[in-house]
């Protein structure tokens, strides 16, 4: 498929973060947006609240403590899934994260900190993942301006 004569698969999709280390050292993180969440949905089904009977009939008990706990864990794994799978182009050799084990994904930040990254640097890595997976107004505006100017300049910062 082409859009305006361009095959979307040929456009760059990798975003890069370079964290300096001393005068000459650097850590390079690369992230790409995830195309879908099918693998996540298969490995981590969304929790369902228990039902309760009220005077109005049967309704979901969204205040159930077990449901809230399950939902919190689910949302943490979902965020961690975005992080570890978006960072695949970085070729990170995780210490405790196993890509096939959803319960370990939440260790991404622990592993990065154990490797020497600060809280701020971990925040920048998370921002990189967010940037790779979001189509924000700034990106759309830049693309519009480049299109209207008739240029084809890479959209990355």
What residues fall within each predicted segment?
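A structural detector for beta-sheet-dominated domains
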Residues: 4, 18-20, 30-32
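Short acidic-hydrophobic surface loop/beta-edge motif
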Residues: 12-24
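Extended acidic low-complexity intrinsically disordered regions
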Residues: 1-13
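Short, surface-exposed, charged amphipathic helix/loop patches that serve as local interaction elements
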Residues: 25-157
């Amino acid at each position: 498929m082409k859009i305006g004569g361009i095959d979307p698969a040929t456009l760059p999709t990798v975003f890069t973060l370079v964290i300096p280390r001393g005068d000459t050292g650097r850590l390079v993180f690369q992230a790409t947006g995830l195309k879908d969440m099918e693998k996540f949905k298969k490995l981590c089904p969304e929790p369902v609240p228990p039902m309760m009977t009220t005077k109005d009939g049967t309704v979901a008990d969204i205040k159930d403590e077990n449901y809230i706990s399950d939902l919190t864990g689910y949302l943490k794994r979902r965020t961690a899934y975005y992080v570890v799978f978006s960072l695949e182009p970085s070729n990170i050799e995780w210490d405790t994260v196993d890509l096939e084990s959803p319960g370990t994904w939440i260790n991404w930040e622990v592993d990065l900190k154990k490797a020497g990254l600060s809280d701020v640097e971990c925040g920048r890595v998370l921002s990189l993942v967010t940037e790779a997976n979001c189509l924000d107004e700034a990106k759309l505006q830049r693309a519009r301006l480049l299109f209207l100017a008739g240029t084809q300049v890479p959209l990355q910062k």
